[in-house]
Amino acid sequence: MKRFARKETIYLRGEEARTLYRLEEGLVRVVELLPDGRLITLRHVLPGDYFGEEALEGKAYRYTAEAMTEAVVQGLDPRAMDHEALHRVARNLARQMRRVQAYEAHLQTGELRARIARYLLFLADTPLSARDRQGIYVTVSHEEIADATASIRESVSKVLADLRREGLIATAYRRVYLLDLAALEREAGSALEAA
């Protein structure tokens, strides 16, 4: 088991893929750096999920994996895995594929406001969420929201300010409080599921 700090890179695009990973605790995102310098989130890895699947083929990692929270990760040698273990990996990757397909639909449907509402509700069911005396919040930056909603930070900041003015959310440093879940669900239009 290895611990990674928030924002720490687990592997980089182009590195030789010798290790298949399983997330034990925390939240990881798989990202791609675009030619224009923007980072886009391709997939969220939840506890129990496998990632770095390029190791199953013995290829280089195609994307970069980064911890969004403090994360505990188990490294596995796919060559040492038995048939049943590989079958578990395949089932998990199939579940993740369904999430990725839903995530693609999320990015391609609705205005930015709806995409942000969906993403905040999605994060409420991940290790990025917590509760304090003010209510449920997610620990996320405007930049991370932009990366996950095919947007830019400035546009995200404007939408968050509108949602805050309307009483749907409150914000603090790297925290977004979800004050009115029903209204956020109406804004979202459809759910982006974590499981």
UniProtKB/Swiss-Prot annotation:
| Matching InterPro entries | cNMP-bd_dom, cNMP-bd_dom_sf, Env_Response_Regulators, HTH_CRP, RmlC-like_jellyroll, WH-like_DNA-bd_sf, WH_DNA-bd_sf
Which SMART domains did the record assign?
Answer: cNMP, HTH_CRP
| Disruption of the gene: reported phenotype | No production of carotenoids in dark or light conditions. Does not activate expression of TT_P0044, TT_P0049 or TT_P0070 in dark or light conditions.
What Gene Ontology terms for biological process does this UniProt record contain? cellular response to light stimulus; positive regulation of carotenoid biosynthetic process
Gene3D superfamilies, from UniProt?
A: Jelly Rolls, Winged helix-like DNA-binding domain superfamily/Winged helix DNA-binding domain
Q: What UniProt keywords apply to this chain's record, in alphabetical order?
A: DNA-binding, Plasmid, Transcription, Transcription regulation
Question: According to the UniProt record, which residues make up the DNA-binding region?
Answer: 142-161
Where's the HTH crp-type domain?
110-182
Q: Name one GO cellular component term.
A: cytosol
Molecular-function GO term, any one: DNA binding
- Keyword match Transcription: yes
Cited PANTHER family: CRP FAMILY TRANSCRIPTIONAL REGULATORY PROTEIN, HTH-TYPE TRANSCRIPTIONAL REGULATOR ARCR
Query: What does the UniProt record say this protein does?
Result: Activates transcription. Positively regulates PcrtB promoter upstream of the crtB operon in a cAMP-independent manner. Regulated genes include genes encoding DNA photolyase, phytoene synthase and cytochrome P450 monooxygenase, which are involved in carotenoid biosynthesis. Positively regulates the light-inducible gene cluster in the megaplasmid in a cAMP-independent manner.
Its recorded name reads: Transcriptional regulator LdrP
Q: State the organism of origin.
A: Thermus thermophilus (strain ATCC BAA-163 / DSM 7039 / HB27)
